[in-house]
Amino acid sequence: ALHAAETRLLVFGTLHTNSAATAVDRLTDGFPPDEQEQVRIVLSEVLKAVVAQLLLRKKGGGRVPAFEVLRGSAALANAIREGKTATITSLIQTGRSHGMVGMDQYLAELVFQDLVDVDEAADKAVDKEYFKSLVEKRRAGEIK
């Protein structure tokens, strides 16, 4: 798949992960340790986007999806190339103007649309403290 992407073919893949950052880690960790640096280099050059999805219990029954969207950027490429995937979550949190949506931001929005219980959303949050601060700031009227 990486070789196909290098030739400018559009490649889609699916992984069972809870966040975009975890998906990037899973992609590189799937290779032998002696190949991971090269994989990170290639991935940093070809990755255009990652979409993560979770299903949560909806108030009143059923399920509702929550999404995280990571878009390719120079900062993302550097993080992947240097193996600093722990910074990807913060890139997403600050990349809203570039079309990125953080899982925790999306979860907080579902809470405020009264679609899911705050405890259900908190359980699925990537960064529990960040999610908690979003909920508190929204309740205090500091953010919309």
Q: What is the meaning of each model-derived region?
A:
Residues 1-144:
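Short, flexible helix-loop junctions that flank or precede catalytic/ligand sites
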